[in-house]
Amino acid sequence: MATGGYRTSSGLGGSTTDFLEEWKAKREKMRAKQNPPGPAPPGGGSSDAAGKPPAGALGTPAAAAANELNNNLPGGAPAAPAVPGPGGVNCAVGSAMLTRAAPGPRRSEDEPPAASASAAPPPQRDEEEPDGVPEKGKSSGPSARKGKGQIEKRKLREKRRSTGVVNIPAAECLDEYEDDEAGQKERKREDAITQQNTIQNEAVNLLDPGSSYLLQEPPRTVSGRYKSTTSVSEEDVSSRYSRTDRSGFPRYNRDANVSGTLVSSSTLEKKIEDLEKEVVRERQENLRLVRLMQDKEEMIGKLKEEIDLLNRDLDDIEDENEQLKQENKTLLKVVGQLTR
């Protein structure tokens, strides 16, 4: 601690004087920073007046400090007595130091002017406070409010950013989480409804009312033949719609069951139609083959008849040949007899 200057003979008086001088030096430095330096006072060194008072004028700044400390006291606290000289400075400052822990709000109109001419305060003295008081209440001024507003703006700007980690309050997080859950439930319900509607539409489209003219077998044989396919399709349908049943939509369970039965019946009817079409094709093929067989048999019969006709002709020709041979023999005999 830079004490510099006049020291009293007693240790307590010296410490209080050093404290006052240091406090006044700090105050003057703060004023010099805030206000431009004015013209130097006549008849004295400006550096000594700014840093510490002269030894002869010790009583006057001490009295001014005591008055200023009395003005800083709250309304119910007793004021420090006036200080006539250096001897009384210790008592006044000691009582002021005891009551300085809880200073009240300082008003500009209650502050008296300074007593000494060498340490005359600038015109903005009523707007300033001692060094110890603003350190405690630093966050209650306009600059603090401005800083708080900037911090709030910065927080709002961080909320608007798309990247980075932003500290969101817990209440907002819970509300957003509940909103997300409600939205997901609504989306699940809508998806289930749309899926059921599409399945019903597909089942209606698959049902062909004009397929009744096809050859139909009795229901017992159909059920017995396609029992395995019905069980497999029912298992597929139950596994497909088990999620819908487990998801907690009892309103749509009936629709899901109806759609499942429609899907199973549609698949069965489609398989039956395919099989009936195959049977019709096979029967048509059989008819074609039978017709071919009949045609071939007819051709074979015709050929047999022709063969019989040819055999008869051959017999007739052989008979004629025998007759011609006999006639030739007779002619040869006649010619031989004539030539003799």
UniProtKB/Swiss-Prot annotation:
Changing L69I: Only slighlty increased interaction with SPSB2. Only slightly increased interaction with SPSB4. Increased interaction with SPSB1, SPSB2 and SPSB4. It comes from the Eukaryota. The modification Phosphothreonine is found at T163. One of its GO terms (cellular component) is intracellular membrane-bounded organelle. GO terms for biological process: actin filament bundle assembly; apoptotic process; apoptotic signaling pathway; negative regulation of B cell proliferation; negative regulation of fibroblast proliferation; negative regulation of gene expression; negative regulation of T cell proliferation; negative regulation of T cell receptor signaling pathway. InterPro entries: Par-4. Residues 186-206 form a coiled coil. This is PRKC apoptosis WT1 regulator protein. Its main location: cytoplasm. Pro-apoptotic protein capable of selectively inducing apoptosis in cancer cells, sensitizing the cells to diverse apoptotic stimuli and causing regression of tumors in animal models. Induces apoptosis in certain cancer cells by activation of the Fas prodeath pathway and coparallel inhibition of NF-kappa-B transcriptional activity. Inhibits the transcriptional activation and augments the transcriptional repression mediated by WT1. Down-regulates the anti-apoptotic protein BCL2 via its interaction with WT1. Also seems to be a transcriptional repressor by itself. A motif (Nuclear localization signal) lies at residues 145-161. It is found in: Cytoplasm; Nucleus. Widely expressed. Expression is elevated in various neurodegenerative diseases such as amyotrophic lateral sclerosis, Alzheimer, Parkinson and Huntington diseases and stroke. Down-regulated in several cancers. Residues 182-192, 242-253 have a biased composition (Basic and acidic residues). It comes from Homo sapiens (Human). PANTHER family: PRKC APOPTOSIS WT1 REGULATOR PROTEIN, PROSTATE APOPTOSIS RESPONSE PROTEIN PAR-4. The keyword Nucleotide-binding does not apply. GO terms for molecular function: actin binding; enzyme binding; leucine zipper domain binding; transcription corepressor activity. Changing A66D: No loss of interaction with SPSB1, SPSB2 and SPSB4. The keyword Glycoprotein does not apply. Residues 1-18, 193-203 have a biased composition (Polar residues). The leucine-zipper domain is not essential for apoptosis, but is required for sensitization of cells to exogenous apoptotic insults and for interaction with its partners. The SAC domain is a death-inducing domain selective for apoptosis induction in cancer cells. This domain is essential for nuclear entry, Fas activation, inhibition of NF-kappa-B activity and induction of apoptosis in cancer cells.
